[in-house]
Swiss-Prot record:
Reactions catalysed: 5-methyl-5,6,7,8-tetrahydromethanopterin + coenzyme M + 2 Na(+)(in) = 5,6,7,8-tetrahydromethanopterin + methyl-coenzyme M + 2 Na(+)(out)
Upper taxonomic lineage: Archaea, Methanobacteriati, Methanobacteriota, Methanomada group, Methanococci
Protein name: Tetrahydromethanopterin S-methyltransferase subunit B
Keywords: Cell membrane, Membrane, Methanogenesis, Methyltransferase, One-carbon metabolism, Transferase, Translocase, Transmembrane, Transmembrane helix
Species per Swiss-Prot/TrEMBL record: Methanocaldococcus jannaschii (strain ATCC 43067 / DSM 2661 / JAL-1 / JCM 10045 / NBRC 100440) (Methanococcus jannaschii)
HAMAP family, A to Z: MtrB
Gene Ontology molecular function: tetrahydromethanopterin S-methyltransferase activity
Gene symbol of the encoding locus: mtrB
Length: 103
């Protein structure tokens, strides 16, 4: 069974999902240039791939210099060290206040 998508109700345009053909109503064929849409879809696919790869630290960012593999992993180490330092310092300060250590 064919699946149809109505594009416009005023002008009876129908898109057939299985064949990818846009027809006028259910009769004559209407030819449409879809190459600009395909170019935009390709750009969107590259951005989606870059977004998916940003979740994996083994891949470089989309617009980066060559040999930048592992930049996300390195930034993960620095972020962990940064927050670990400040959280540890805060815990030590709380313990010093609770124990009544005089400076």
């Amino acid at each position: 069974m064919a699946t149809y998508v109505f594009i416009d109700q005023n002008i009876p345009l129908v898109y057939t999902v299985e064949t990818g053909v846009i027809t006028k109503g259910f009769g004559d064929l209407l030819f449409v240039d879809v190459s600009p849409i395909e170019e935009q879809i390709k750009k969107l696919e590259t951005l989606v791939d870059a977004y998916e790869h940003s979740l994996d630290p083994r891949y470089p960012p989309l617009n980066s210099f060559p040999n930048r593999d592992g930049v996300y992993a390195i930034s993960g180490y620095f972020k962990s060290a940064f927050f670990g330092f400040w959280i540890g310092l805060g815990i030590m300060a709380l313990l010093a206040i609770i124990l009544g250590v005089k400076f």
